[in-house]
Amino acid sequence: MGLSQSTELGQASSPEELSHMLAERFATKCFTPLELTHFKDNFFTRAAGQGDVKYWNEKILSDFLAIPDSSDAECPLDAGPVIFRMVSYLGAFPFQNTLAPSVLTFEAMVKVVVLLTERYGKVLRRARKDRIRLLFGSLADVGRKDIDQPANDGNSKEDKVDSSATKSHAPGFSVDEPTNDDYEDDDDDLALAALESLDAIEVFRHDSRIDKAVYEARISIATFRRLLMLLLVISPLRPLEPVKAYTSDLNEGRMRTVRQQADNILAAFPQEESGGISYRAFAKTIETSLPYLFDPLTPLFEHLLFSRNLNLSQKRDRSDSTDPTDQTSETPLPLSASIMLPGSFESAILNPSIVSHLSFFLPSTNGSKNLLRDNLRLHPIFSTAAHGSSLTSFSHNVLTWQSGTLLLLEGAVAEPSGEQMVTLGAYLPQPWKTGSSAQSSRLSETSALPCLFQLSPKHLLLPGNPSSSIQNPDTPAAYFSNHSGISLGCRIPPASRSQRLVPSPLGAGSLTIDTSLETAEFHVAPFGHNGVFLPAGTSSTSDNATKTHIDIYNLELWGFVPDPGVSSSEKSAIELQKAKWDFEAREAERRRSLNIKAGAGDSAMEGARWLLETAGIIGDSHGRGGGSV
């Protein structure tokens, strides 16, 4: 398999031997024979070597993955050292605490790819789906306390290899809090599952005890910002797409939006007084607010499983069979189409960096993947910049849309220091309903929950409430009325002829927009489980409830549709909306052509009057009249 000869199970006692055996198991169980062949070719045709040891250093890794580093003067990203330190840590799995940073041998890279592409589920029955603890450890700056340790007799083989393999794993800092008390015991499941069949539990637990007794860790803001900027740039990446297509054209304007979104996301992570991000803050924020943040790493490292040197459709000359081909003369693979479809307007809010930010926490409409991973497209429905600030235009464009929608709002908040720009939004997976003028509050089993969010100046996510107790007609996710405007996450008052009541905020979050679409109020509370939206996962009960008044600059609604390139037997929401508009136009023309002064008993007159009565345009013989939007 390209791995060195394994140690017998009964003789395996050291972390090095057990780590080697686990790599063998990963290689045979988690990759197909073809993937393993491509993997070996990619690794060994590029590997540096000293003696019998073949390994990758930082430059080889960055060049292969096309990740910019400090040596690339043309690219403002500098993520190469960050990715290398992550890989050097993960390559020592499950003994990161004693073996990391590891030399990137083939065995180490096998474990890295399995962990970062989440293929470990094929081998590890008890593996948790998330990789949060491993990713935290790979990013954290680690400082060792001054304690008595046995001397290390001689340097290991890994220490003799090119020092560049570990040079960029920068030393960290120590903090004053107790050591790693935030690592819950159940977070060891991934490593324990990896070793339970290798009779190595005690070895691992010893390694874990060393970690908890010796190390203190925080992720530095500078390190995390560099990784976030890379993830924002490559988030649309699909398997086998060239990474350089996303990293080679980063002009000043693009980098400005990337930095803005990276800072907005960073603001969501509570920071320690001593500096950096603790494990507790990191894990809680990722789990509750940014569940898809690290998804781009999967297609990035899947590049290792396809070698351009192995063109199985053509015979190759043996003389160049071992030469790595980083640059190919073949036609490059086409990039994924933009998630934004052309339509009646171009967005004044969305840009590639904001779309990437959205993909870090918004699911597709079926809830199984993130926004960019399910052939989902955004169709422009309504924009105040294009359609005006009219509720009539809003209802014509939005209430006729038979699919989920994404609402985005950009505006300014008046503060003592001046105006501050804010960007809010709502993910509404169910279509708006014209009968009740509200979005359906009943969710199908396969649908995702709605959510309310803030993108800037600080990332904030108010998740949808899964409780069936709030799925009532008077608590819809979204509500529209000509009298009160647009309401999200509010309680709808009962109809009254004597007074006009407005929807009231309910639960942990709500957004109300006035009838002129010029101002909005954003309510956020750290409590309240009786509404459509729940408190943010990072909020504390000691936080204060806030009400933010916003002057709206832009309001946009985008509809969710499948990729037009994917054939489907069902009509798309775009076709259904066009058919509804055509029907409304025909009915309007028919109404204009009605002659209600026709002779008594005329069937045409009776049909015309019935049509007008049904539409609520005129009253019936009993004096009733009116209608709903």
From Swiss-Prot:
TLDc domain residues are: 348-561
The record's section on PROSITE patterns has:
TLDC (PS51886)
Q: What is its main location?
A: cytoplasm
Keywords from the UniProt entry? Cytoplasm
Record localization:
Cytoplasm
In this chain, composition skew of type Polar residues spans: 322-331
- Pfam families given in the database record: TLD (PF07534)
The record's region (Disordered) falls at 147-181, 315-334
CC terms in the record's Gene Ontology section: cytoplasm
Task: Please state which protein family the record places this protein in.
Answer: Belongs to the RTC5 family.
Q: What does this protein do?
A: May be involved in a process influencing telomere capping.
The name of this protein is Restriction of telomere capping protein 5
Provenance organism: Aspergillus oryzae (strain ATCC 42149 / RIB 40) (Yellow koji mold)
Q: Encoded by which gene?
A: rtc5
